[in-house]
């Protein structure tokens, strides 16, 4: 759980923004969304594998584009 200390004379908006940023860095909202509903282990593995394939395709596309620009 991200904890921030509110500084003296610090506006509430600024403290809230710092808290939101620290929550985003910790990945709390993503974790809450992921755990909102039960996901069967097979479905979880399937989703993880699909995202890995997507990441690899994206990486290869970027590398391919970089090679094309070099010539």
UniProtKB/Swiss-Prot annotation:
UniProt-listed GO biological process terms: translation
Gene3D superfamilies named in the record: Ribosomal protein S8 (1.20.5.1150)
Keywords, alphabetical: Ribonucleoprotein, Ribosomal protein
Family to which the UniProt record says this protein belongs: Belongs to the bacterial ribosomal protein bS21 family.
GO MF entry, a single one: structural constituent of ribosome
HAMAP family associated with the record: Ribosomal_bS21
Organism the protein comes from: Buchnera aphidicola subsp. Acyrthosiphon pisum (strain APS) (Acyrthosiphon pisum symbiotic bacterium)
InterPro entries: Ribosomal_bS21, Ribosomal_bS21_CS, Ribosomal_bS21_sf
Top-level taxon in the UniProt lineage: Bacteria
GO CC field: ribonucleoprotein complex; ribosome
UniProt name for this protein: Small ribosomal subunit protein bS21
